[in-house]
Amino acid sequence: MSIVVQSAVTHFRPVMILAGGTGGHIFPGLAVAGALRARGVPVVWLGATGKMETHLVPKHGIEIQTIAVAGVRGRGMLALLGAPVRVLRAIFAAMGVLRRYRPRVVVSFGGFAAGPGGIAARFMRLPLIVHEQNRAPGMTNRVLARVAKRVLSGFPGSFVAEEVVGNPVRKDIAGLPAPGVRFSGRSGPVRLLVLGGSQGARVMNDALPVVLRVLSDSDVAVEVRHQCGEALCAETERAYAYAGVAARIEPFISDMAAAYAWADLVVCRAGASTLAELCAAGVGSVLIPFPAAVDDHQTRNAEYLVAAGAALLLQQDRALYVYLESVLRDLLSDPMRRLAMAEAARGLAKSDAAECIAEIVLEESI
């Protein structure tokens, strides 16, 4: 399947990006695609039929080719037994796409199509670059890293032989003033930003109103901005109303740079892209990793920020409410600690990641 936005006919061989399935794979790929196109390099995308990338990528003016491929984890024994045949078909389909476009280099950011696409690139002796966003690498990139020409990572410790380049973030977030400048002279209520992600995190929607109600007995005033996901807005509003806590409830925040600039502290999950944004913006955080994340990669991500003093880590378990109350009580009343965490986060930032990856791609082009 082909969704054509820009012509594949060009005087230059394109770079092919392999990424899909989740925004955590797609958005870093889009950032690097933008950096390459700014240099006049054409880009074509290989994704999986019917997945998120087929909707997102064309909106950025990038041509996408798709192959039929799906994951096998958690799909039962029949899916596992039939996997080799489906994988071989996907590899041959990917080889057909590669023959058509003859890319100068292939870059994997992970996802369903990345495995067959990367293996096909290896068979065809095309340069393969792998970028892993998480500290615990996904299955696809673990396989491809063994045959890739360059292995890049967003965090240290993903692979033994790696180049740590960071995860791409939007320029408006990377361009925010330093924490000391933003927080200087700030007065009024402490500004708490809660990010549940595009689908919403029900545990945060449930926990924050209850915890903030308990904290209302303190001397610290808190202003809350809570992004809860479209499907969970009504129940989140009811939870805050029942708790008697005033909050600005939003299904989606379009201007994340402004939200980070506003915040004194963030409570959120620990996806790689979110953590890269926290570091680029320079804001301290309380991280609650998604417990069902594959290979518990969000906990591994969070531990990196915690070790640097940029965040605190809470597990989603029965004691969450108790620990969240204790942590927020301390942080909301301690502006110097919040500033120290924000500065530690900023110290981890690699705000030029997209440009760095683009340069590496061009170095390896044939």
From Swiss-Prot:
UniProt subcellular location: Cell inner membrane
InterPro entries the UniProt entry points to: GlcNAc_MurG, Glyco_trans_28_C, GlycoTrans_28_N
Please give the pathway this protein is involved in: Cell wall biogenesis; peptidoglycan biosynthesis
Q: How does it sit in the membrane?
A: Peripheral membrane protein
Q: Which residues cross the membrane?
A: none
What does the record give as EC number? 2.4.1.227
Say yes or no: keyword Membrane present. yes
Q: Which GO terms describe its biological process?
A: carbohydrate metabolic process; cell division; cell wall organization; lipid glycosylation; peptidoglycan biosynthetic process; regulation of cell shape
Asked if Glycosyltransferase is a keyword of the record, the answer is: yes
Quickly give the catalysed reaction: di-trans,octa-cis-undecaprenyl diphospho-N-acetyl-alpha-D-muramoyl-L-alanyl-D-glutamyl-meso-2,6-diaminopimeloyl-D-alanyl-D-alanine + UDP-N-acetyl-alpha-D-glucosamine = di-trans,octa-cis-undecaprenyl diphospho-[N-acetyl-alpha-D-glucosaminyl-(1->4)]-N-acetyl-alpha-D-muramoyl-L-alanyl-D-glutamyl-meso-2,6-diaminopimeloyl-D-alanyl-D-alanine + UDP + H(+)
Q: Which GO terms describe its molecular function?
A: UDP-N-acetyl-D-glucosamine:N-acetylmuramoyl-L-alanyl-D-glutamyl-meso-2,6-diaminopimelyl-D-alanyl-D-alanine-diphosphoundecaprenol 4-beta-N-acetylglucosaminlytransferase activity; undecaprenyldiphospho-muramoylpentapeptide beta-N-acetylglucosaminyltransferase activity
Which Gene3D superfamilies does the record associate with it?
Glycogen Phosphorylase B (3.40.50.2000)
Q: Which UniProt keywords apply?
A: Cell cycle, Cell division, Cell inner membrane, Cell membrane, Cell shape, Cell wall biogenesis/degradation, Glycosyltransferase, Membrane, Peptidoglycan synthesis, Transferase
User: Pfam families recorded for this chain?
Assistant: Glyco_tran_28_C, Glyco_transf_28
Q: Which residues bind UDP-N-acetyl-alpha-D-glucosamine?
A: 22-24, 134, 170, 198, 253, 298
Can you supply one Gene Ontology CC term for this chain's record?
plasma membrane
| Alphabetized NCBIfam families for the sequence | murG (TIGR01133)
Per the record, the similarity remark reads: Belongs to the glycosyltransferase 28 family. MurG subfamily.
Tell me, what does this protein do in biology? Answer: Cell wall formation. Catalyzes the transfer of a GlcNAc subunit on undecaprenyl-pyrophosphoryl-MurNAc-pentapeptide (lipid intermediate I) to form undecaprenyl-pyrophosphoryl-MurNAc-(pentapeptide)GlcNAc (lipid intermediate II).
Question: What PANTHER family has UniProt attached to this entry?
Answer: GLYCOSYLTRANSFERASE, UDP-N-ACETYLGLUCOSAMINE--N-ACETYLMURAMYL-(PENTAPEPTIDE) PYROPHOSPHORYL-UNDECAPRENOL N-ACETYLGLUCOSAMINE TRANSFERASE 1
Q: What is this protein called?
A: UDP-N-acetylglucosamine--N-acetylmuramyl-(pentapeptide) pyrophosphoryl-undecaprenol N-acetylglucosamine transferase
